Amino acid sequence: MLTDRVLTLLAPALRASGAIVVDATVGLGGHAAAVLTAFPHVRLVGLDRDPDALERSGERLHGLAPGRVELVHAVYDEVAEILDRLGHPVVQGILFDLGVSSLQLDTDDRGFAYSRDAPLDMRMDQTRGRTAADVLNTYDADALTRILREYGEERFARRIAGAIVQARAVTPFATSARLADLVRDAIPAPARRTGGNPAKRTFQALRIEVNAELDVLARALPAAFDALAVSGRLVVLSYHSLEDRLVKRQLRGYAEASVPPDLPVVPEGAGPRLRWLTRGAEPASETEKAENPRAASVRLRAVERTAPNPDHTRKPTGGAS
């Protein structure tokens, strides 16, 4: 199971007395509870941008491990600032479980699910920011085409964007069912019969845009890596190819020497600063996919920090674009 694999990967870094682990996307606290149970001496810092999820996980985790849990309402690219504020500038383990939580998917009025009619919100933090309806009703056709193509990998992006602009001129978008129907009608009939629900890619693109998910992830990974102690471990669970490619690209920058490849001797401090713990991206087992269909798309990558930052710190390659 994925949780068991996460525990196995984190275990060598969390065995030391006083170890601190960060769950950067604590959600309902499933992974966090497993970590706190498996490692009774570990302290956990949990972050989440969703105040509803944080309230629920707080009830669960504070009861499970009194005095060992600190929960903070924050987006995970704020991890360095949060850890400094809490007095934990260096930690032994960090976990990212990306994407939409079960709570968000299963709560109708959040608007994440294209299979149910709901307000077009899609904010992971409903206390701030623009909604999916705001994006649909204010972005021009070119901007809509761009996000559908880049974030949804939608080959009919321009057709869908044009249909959105035309439809909103009559009535602004407010609910998910209307958008799902429009996408289905905008896509050629043969394409509707393959690849699952035709609205899936459009909803993914809007969600990523509303929550700036790839931009946040591109900032969060370097900050998280810098907060890791030497021998500390970072585990990332991604749920679509855009996330996974970004994770791979960012971390690969730390796995390479920061000198020309033909240099005969690598200077001290210029060598790789991590080693991969996973060979490529690990999927969920077939058993887990059968028990939990939402695990079907997961890709797990993990690394161990092997060296501190050099004085001439080189930023990892990659980014959100």
Swiss-Prot record:
Its EC number is 2.1.1.199. GO terms for biological process: rRNA base methylation. Disulfide bonds: none annotated. This is Ribosomal RNA small subunit methyltransferase H. Its main location: cytoplasm. It catalyses: cytidine(1402) in 16S rRNA + S-adenosyl-L-methionine = N(4)-methylcytidine(1402) in 16S rRNA + S-adenosyl-L-homocysteine + H(+). S-adenosyl-L-methionine binds at G29, G30, H31, D48, Y76, D97, Q104. SUPFAM superfamilies: Putative methyltransferase TM0872, insert domain, S-adenosyl-L-methionine-dependent methyltransferases. It is an enzyme of class 2 (transferase). Coiled coil: none annotated. Keywords: Cytoplasm, Methyltransferase, rRNA processing, S-adenosyl-L-methionine, Transferase. InterPro entries: RsmH (IPR002903), SAM-dep_MeTrfase_MraW_recog (IPR023397), SAM-dependent_MTases_sf (IPR029063). It comes from Frankia casuarinae (strain DSM 45818 / CECT 9043 / HFP020203 / CcI3). One of its GO terms (cellular component) is cytoplasm.
